Amino acid sequence: MEGTVKWFNSQKGYGFIIDSERKDVFVHQNSIKMDGFRHLNEDDIVNFELGAGKNGREQAINVQPILTRKMVEDSLKEEKLYVKTMKDAFGNKAYMVVDQNNVIQSSEQGMSFLDLAAYAGFDTEGLSA
């Protein structure tokens, strides 16, 4: 199943994913399938399965990142562009792109993570955040 990272505390090694039914699902770093330091960022899009944790409670297992903020940032860096976070007019988290002189290259109102990924050239069709 697909989900969006709600939050993840890298120091403590856990966080929550919002699943397709808008339910919070616990995730522990031991369940993340990636090389190196296992962590997630808010708004990362992941695939996961539901399973039982060590305490028997339901949690996300076999978590695999699909589209991450780091992937988007790395792609934009090649063009000497950078991501800034902001709050939109409704107080929601939004993103904008700036160049090395801090000149805005995207909408001043900000955009969603999926819009940011599309701006960076990623195929976001079929993904939901």
Task: Label each region the model flagged.
Residues 24-36:
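Beta-strand/loop nucleic-acid-binding surfaces
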Residues 34-47:
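Short nucleic-acid-contacting surface segments enriched for D/E, G, S/T with interspersed K/R
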Residues 12-17:
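Short aromatic-glycine-enriched beta-strand elements
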Residues 65-80:
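Negatively charged, low-complexity tracts enriched in Asp/Glu with abundant Ser/Thr
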Residues 1-9:
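Structural detector for short beta-strands of small beta-barrel domains
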Residues 51-67:
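OB-fold/S1-family single-stranded nucleic acid-binding modules
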